[in-house]
Amino acid sequence: MSFHAVARKQPHRGWGILESGGVALVVIVVITVVLGGLYMLWNRKNIALESANVQSIITSTQGLLKGRNGYNYTSGTVMTGLLIQVGGAPKNMMTKGNVTAGTATLWNTWGGQVIVAPVIANGFNHGFSVSYPKVPQDACIAITTRLSAGGSISGISINSTAFSDGNVTVENAGAVCVKDTGRSGINTLTFTVNG
């Protein structure tokens, strides 16, 4: 009788804790990268959208609100309400209040109330300004430099710093656009148009 040594098979024990932890770590990294990319795209969309909104407000104001004596309105509240009433506000912007009465207000993506107001120069209301509050720092830099390159804006103010020629470089904007507090932007942009 002979004895044969039979190799004993080790039972399959499945995944170990180390393998499970490694897979979980890879999944977390992938989710983080995807969410970060989505946040960047969302932010860029807001910047492009609000740049277009400012341009649309300027064009609509020039075409719909300029009268024989320029922009002869008593206040920015009245002028903004009338712009909304005549259909000159971008449709993607939020309005609050009574649109048909001309008392509605206009709000940007970041929750700031946008005001279109007459600007008096040499005793005449031949210009107007568009005030954009609560703008985040990155959007402040991008929007001001983008609209500065367009050439239709006579002056740009970032917070309390005025660029009376309407020319704002990335370096200029980067120096005066203030960082956000938490997740809220605190920059106020004012675009002035003569004519």
Go through the PLM ranges and name each one.
Residues 32, 39-78, 82:
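Membrane-proximal N-terminal amphipathic helix
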Residues 1-46, 50:
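N-terminal single-pass transmembrane signal-anchor helix
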